[in-house]
Amino acid sequence: MNAIILISVLGILSMMSEFIGLKKLIYPIILISLIGILGYNACTFWNNPETHYGMLVHNNYSVAFGSLLITITLFWFILFRSSYSSGEFNQGDHYALILFSTVGGLVLVSFSNMSMLFLGVEILSIPLYILAGSRKKDLHSVESSIKYFILGSFATGIMLLGIALIYGATGSFDFATIEKTASADPLFFIGITLLSIAFAFKVSAVPFHFWVPDVYSGAPTFITAFMSTFVKVAAFGAFYLMLDSIFESVPTYLSHTLIGLSALTIVVGNIAASYQDNVKRMLAFSGVSQAGYMLMVFPILTISAKTSLFVYLAGYAIANLIAIYIVQVVEKSKGDARVENFSGLGKSNPFLAFVLSLSLISLAGIPPAAGFFGKFYLFTEVIHAGNIYLVLIAILGSLISVYYYFKTIIAMYSGEEVSTLTNPAFGFTSVILAIMSALVVLIGLFPDILLQIGMNI
């Protein structure tokens, strides 16, 4: 609750920074504040659970996922600061919108009432509708914003209808009451299904993924980085929290639906990604396939399943942020992110090539990176639940992903150098990239810390 209030105040301060003479100071203020808020939030992990006005709950789950979301926001601010150096974008307004979106994400992982679920989704999404189209003279960016807004509004309508039906069946917006009064009323199950469809849109599960490639490729790359990491973590955290708050075990019909969605998302996402020759668009479809892996544990409402989801999301978010940052560097230098523009990067900038390779290896699930352990732990949980065929599909999908991830890696190290990058990573940014890359390896080699956190949420 305190983190939500503090980041909200920080967003308002950023929005007013030009008027109160803090334009040059707002960036360090945001960084220092986020570090302080992250530290404060993490220190409350072992506190007793608290409910605020029956709307928000402060417990280990909200603290763990909230800390992960704040960490993603902090890394985003550090990595993509250079995006505002040209003066094309209003720095204070953009920073404020990102912070407000962060508030929405924190609400989504701590709600205990359906009204707060809806508010969290809207607070998260509305700033991103604006940011996706912030490159006003670029028709692709404008198209991205319009598509995201229209389809996002459609998903919101489905969510509202689901909430209304659940309220009609149970007479309450409170999840604790819904859990006690849930019955065989068809309205209740239709409502849950509609809510699940709305979340499937937010996490880009097939067949609700059709907006992803156009929105991600059309939006400014630094906004794509935020959407593909922060939004995905917040949406998955909220989706699992909703199911865990209502059911002791997922109903059979919903379990089979989620398994089918997971398998379809893995297959379609990986096959579509393998046909892309633009790395940014490839990462968009890769994000779709990654959503399929995460959905595998949703029919399993156990502590270990929750832990595997948390660990996987942490590794995915860090690796994806690194990859998209380097895509932006190449885009600025070469004009776009086609695979051939990465040719020879291993010779012209070995550091960038190495960290990009490491992030792609992690996304592919190859040891010793975080992605390998995340997939291993996740697959193990699904096998224990008896869904062996789903794991076989996931393994096949992972094998397909090796092809398109390594297509970029091979181009970097075996291709002829096209030209030297005009905007290579340097200074503080390179230090942060090194730290994030180290985290990708350390999570893979020493996952015990994240496992301990996960087992207590």
From Swiss-Prot:
GO terms for biological process: ATP synthesis coupled electron transport. Its EC number is 7.1.1.-. It catalyses: a quinone + NADH + 5 H(+)(in) = a quinol + NAD(+) + 4 H(+)(out). It is a multi-pass membrane protein. It is found in: Cell inner membrane. NDH-1 shuttles electrons from NADH, via FMN and iron-sulfur (Fe-S) centers, to quinones in the respiratory chain. The immediate electron acceptor for the enzyme in this species is believed to be a menaquinone. Couples the redox reaction to proton translocation (for every two electrons transferred, four hydrogen ions are translocated across the cytoplasmic membrane), and thus conserves the redox energy in a proton gradient. Belongs to the complex I subunit 2 family. NDH-1 is composed of 14 different subunits. Subunits NuoA, H, J, K, L, M, N constitute the membrane sector of the complex. This is NADH-quinone oxidoreductase subunit N. It comes from Cytophaga hutchinsonii (strain ATCC 33406 / DSM 1761 / CIP 103989 / NBRC 15051 / NCIMB 9469 / D465). The gene is nuoN.
